[in-house]
Amino acid sequence: MPGLNFNDRVALITGASTGIGASTAVRMGECGVKVALNYFESQTEAKKVAESVEASGGVSLLIRADVRNAGQVSEMVVRTVKAFGKIDILVNNAGGMVKRVPVVEMDDATWDEVMNLNLRSVFYCSRAVVPHMIGRKYGRIINVSSVAAFMGGGRNAAVYAASKAGINGLTKGLAKELAPHGITVNSVAPGVIDTPFHARAETGSYDQFLPSIPMNRVGTADEVASLIAYLASDDSSYITGSVLHVNGGQYLG
């Protein structure tokens, strides 16, 4: 993306093997960013993303880590700093629906599983990375939320919606806390995006969503990645504590 200023930055992107995370990694690579690519399940897909980053002119580092595990998150951050010397940008993208369960049938384990993946992971990664940013008086943290945080989610997705709403609250709190240290913190809230996540989470075709989307189409991972890249760049220096929507008009709040 010509025009964005990254000034020799280093980014750590969680959940970078597919979808929005993968597109963000490639976009960062195009801008000359050194990118640490976190994945957990699919090494094959992660390697493909790393190859795309390298082909675009960037530098990549693959790190397998479960972002629900504080110890593995700490080790991931240590490895990134050891390889690149610093971390300027953190994109908390890892997350998922897990499964759709009516609240009256939901057990504690399912609640915890969703919260751990979508919200606790953001806390763990931010806690581990922020000290490195404070020391340099610079940082960009972008958290991937969802339109579900504002619209309640789809069928039997209350816990997913709650976890994504929690991300937005954490984003605002961190933005206040970290602003004096030169660190901005923002959320991106995608709507219906054509990614493997939505392919797994939804039943039926994307056509079912079109009546609720004024633009009459679903979004692409690249469109979300473009916004994340802007928020990660030096050009977004006066934006913090914001939740930015990428949903084709599905939510107009």
Language-model segments: residues:
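Short, small/polar-rich loop/turn modules that mediate ligand/substrate recognition or access, typified
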Residues: 179, 184, 239-241, 247
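Active-site helix of classical SDR
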Residues: 126, 163, 171
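Alpha-helical segment proximal to the catalytic Tyr-Lys
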Residues: 131, 176-180, 237
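The beta1-alpha1 cofactor-binding region of Rossmann-like NAD(H)/NADP(H)-dependent oxidoreductases
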Residues: 43-44, 64-76, 108, 221-223
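Substrate-binding pocket helix/loop in short-chain dehydrogenase/reductase
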Residues: 101-103, 107-115, 141, 209
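Residue(s) in the substrate-gating loop at a strand-loop-helix junction
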Residues: 146
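Conserved glycine-rich cofactor-binding loop
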Residues: 10, 17-18
